[in-house]
Structures are given as C-alpha cells and as structure tokens.
UniProtKB/Swiss-Prot annotation:
Recorded family membership: Belongs to the ATPase delta chain family.
Protein name (record): ATP synthase subunit delta 2
Underlying gene: atpH2
Keyword Hydrolase carried by entry: no
Source organism (scientific name): Photobacterium profundum (strain SS9)
Keyword terms of this UniProt record: ATP synthesis, Cell inner membrane, Cell membrane, CF(1), Hydrogen ion transport, Ion transport, Membrane, Transport
Record text on subunit structure and interactions: F-type ATPases have 2 components, F(1) - the catalytic core - and F(0) - the membrane proton channel. F(1) has five subunits: alpha(3), beta(3), gamma(1), delta(1), epsilon(1). F(0) has three main subunits: a(1), b(2) and c(10-14). The alpha and beta chains form an alternating ring which encloses part of the gamma chain. F(1) is attached to F(0) by a central stalk formed by the gamma and epsilon chains, while a peripheral stalk is formed by the delta and b chains.
GO function terms (MF aspect): proton-transporting ATP synthase activity, rotational mechanism
Lineage of producing organism: Bacteria, Pseudomonadati, Pseudomonadota, Gammaproteobacteria, Vibrionales
Length: 182
C-alpha cells in the first residue's frame, strides 16, 4: 500500500463506518467523489501541497474556500470531515479516501466492476453470458464496463478486482513467440 493510501485508510474507514451507520453510503460516495474531484484540480492541488495546515490562518481560509466550491453538495457531516482532514494536512489524500471508500462499499454490497476490453463491441447476449459467468466465479454482483481496444487484435481482456483473464489474440501470439524462442 502506498504511503498516501496508508494515510487515507483511517479516514476512509471512518467515513464508511459513519455512512453505514447512517444508511447513507450512496450519499457519502457522491460527496467524497465531489471532494476528490475538487482536490484533484491542478490549482487546488498546488495550494494543498503548499499550505501549512497546522493552525495557519490562511489554511482556514483555504479550507473555507474549498468548502465553498463544494457548496450545496456536502452535508454538515462531510464538511466537518473535510475540516478535520484539512486541520491534519490530509486533503491531498481525498482521492485515495474515495477509492478506499468505494472498495469498502463494493465489498459490503457484494458488487464488483469488471472492465472488459475487446476489439469489437460485445453483443447483449455476450454481455449477459459474461456477467453470469463472472458472477458465478466471483460470487458477487458484476457491473460491466465494456471498452474497445483495437490493439488487442482479437479476443478480450477482463479485469475484475485482482482477477485478470487475458483471452486476447495478442496475448496468445506473445505466448507462442515465447515458447518458440525457448
């Protein structure tokens, strides 16, 4: 786990536990997406990196500006969450907090997103069959994210969490080439 993820972990856990206890997982996911998006903007990110948040008056002003940008999109609890993160100089990890929160949410809801790369668009029947097979293998509800990647030559590449199924023609050709060179 990267340093930023390590720092983000307790914040993500606190947000998740609070959201779960208050039956507001979807609302918190949206609010954290908002804060992560704001924190990822180049101008804001630069300020986050430069400000000393430990008791500085300009840090309070920056935090208020940050919350003003999110005006109407964060409830009181999420605003307090952002303030606590700012007081501890941790706004830089908001994107990591979001990612960890979403992992916890997906784990709790027993869902997983599977990214499918193929040369041509999948038919509805192929999508249905793929979802059924993945749900059986992963024991989770699967949401497909189908993308076109013409560099694959043929076949498909499936990524779901830590599972990677490489059924591409490109991969088969590379394995054949490796075995011929051995």
């Amino acid at each position: 786990m990267s340093d930023l993820k390590t720092i983000a972990q307790p914040y993500a856990k606190a947000a998740f536990d609070f959201a779960l206890a208050n039956k507001s997982l979807d609302q918190w996911a949206y609010m954290l997406m908002t804060t992560a998006e704001v924190a990822s903007q180049p101008v804001i990110l630069q300020e986050i990196k430069e400000i000393d948040f430990k008791g500085a008056k300009n840090a309070e002003a920056f935090t208020q500006m940050f919350l003003d940008i999110c005006e109407g999109l964060l409830d009181e609890h999420c605003q307090n969450f952002v303030r606590v993160m700012a007081e501890n100089g941790r706004l830089i990890v908001l994107p990591d907090v979001l990612n960890l929160f979403m992992e916890m949410k997906a784990d709790f809801e027993r869902t997983i997103e599977a990214t499918v790369l193929s040369v041509e668009p999948l038919t509805e029947e192929q999508k249905v069959n793929l979802v059924k097979a993945l749900e059986k293998r992963l024991s989770r509800t699967v949401e497909l994210d189908c993308q076109i990647d013409e560099s694959l030559v043929g076949g498909m590449l499936i990524k779901a969490g830590e599972l990677v199924i490489d059924g591409t023609l490109k991969s088969s050709i590379n394995r054949l080439a490796s075995s011929l060179q051995a």
